[in-house]
């Protein structure tokens, strides 16, 4: 494969990263690299993202979420109950493992189940509802998606401030999802059920990841520093399952880094800084929603956060705009 083809493939697979890299390089032409560049990144956010990706990979390696889905399935007595269980599973799991990981985990499981009960004609609607549920559920916690994690870390939002910004929307969305599911035509389930795959992971295998997740939550709310937790997570994963390091989305981390450089440089160009402050300040909700529609919610959160102090409004905007 030629270098040009490799670049083309990289751009197709990691479009947001490539765009962020180009923006960072172009901004560096206007603001020459110096020692101030080291102050651009939010190292706390980068460390937390890295740690959480390792922890979620650990949970997935133990089959935790698939087993949870099978347990709910065994208790479902009708198609409506099954659909509600799967949608709620996506909604609540996305609060911890992000919407992308939730969908990667449960959509294939849903397709398998509906093939086994011979209801393939009903699965598309359910997958759409699962996608909506995962996106809406992920907005309800600081670790549910990268933009929440970044804004909570950068702004130092308290749990109360975070809850006021997003929980009313998350709660309303859950009610609407349930209403749609209850209006669906109900049918009895067949006898087919997915079989259990091996023994459940023992609590001793889950314990390290649960403890590490608790430590990350303490970092989010600035109870403990991020450096000791980063070292702790890395050491535990090295000892327990070093292959998990391959599951980290390093391009996402590099995307954050490139946007930090781009925004840091923009703030050092007085004319652009003043213009963006006037456009964003006082208009965080509209600016966040529009930017999320154009460049997606994570870049929008990073970009706009450099030009406002109303982080709660921006948090609401990038979550709603990313739906």
Outline where the language-model segments fall.
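Transmembrane helical segments that form the transport core of multi-pass membrane transport proteins
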Residues: 40, 62, 66-69, 211-306
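Juxtamembrane and boundary regions of transmembrane helices in multi-pass small-molecule transporters
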Residues: 2-5, 128, 160-202
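Hydrophobic transmembrane alpha-helices that form the pore/transport pathway of multi-pass ion
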Residues: 86-88, 92-139, 150, 302-319
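C-terminal transmembrane helix pair
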Residues: 163-174, 285-323
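Interfacial loop-to-helix junctions that mark the boundaries of transmembrane helices
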Residues: 6-13, 35-45, 157-169, 198-203, ...
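Hydrophobic mid-bilayer segments of alpha-helices in multi-pass membrane transport proteins
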Residues: 2-30, 42-54, 205-216, 223-238, ...
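Small-residue-rich segments of transmembrane alpha-helices in multi-pass membrane proteins
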Residues: 20-26, 49-52, 77-88, 130-141, ...
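Membrane-interfacial loop-to-helix junctions in multi-pass transporters
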Residues: 43-45, 74-87, 116-126, 204-207, ...
